[in-house]
Amino acid sequence: MRTAAKGNAAEAAVLHALIERDLNVLVPFGDGQPYDLVVQIPPEGFLRVQCKTARRKKGCLVFNARTTDHGKGRLPYVGLADLFGVYFPPTQSVYLVPVRDAQTYYGWLRLDPTRNNQRRRVKFAAEYEIERWTIDALAGLLKAGRAPLRLAA
């Protein structure tokens, strides 16, 4: 599948999963923003979601956690988006990962148990499944992460 088609499939899957959870989702016009979707969290504000496709590697889901290089180098999404909406095509699973939880070049979510039973500093995929995110948990991201985005009146 072409890169653009993969991105479109991920965006559609994340959009569908968010709408299924009765969340209001806005889709920005054009490709000029560093995020693909915006989720309204009333009355707090809005969360920006960057959609990514994950692949399986070494018992983990791996996704690109940097922006596309447009002559500026590959930059982190910190301050540009709030969440990664991560889609894993083989299982059609969607995960929501706060950008602050994936600040390296790649985001890693562990699917398989670690060989040494380590849990510290391991991000288990099950903890980020979209089904685990309540409206209160999403609102907590706004309160903890940054000032809420507000639409002009």
Which residues are covered by each model-predicted region?
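Mixed-charge (Asp/Glu-Lys/Arg
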Residues: 1-33, 38-153
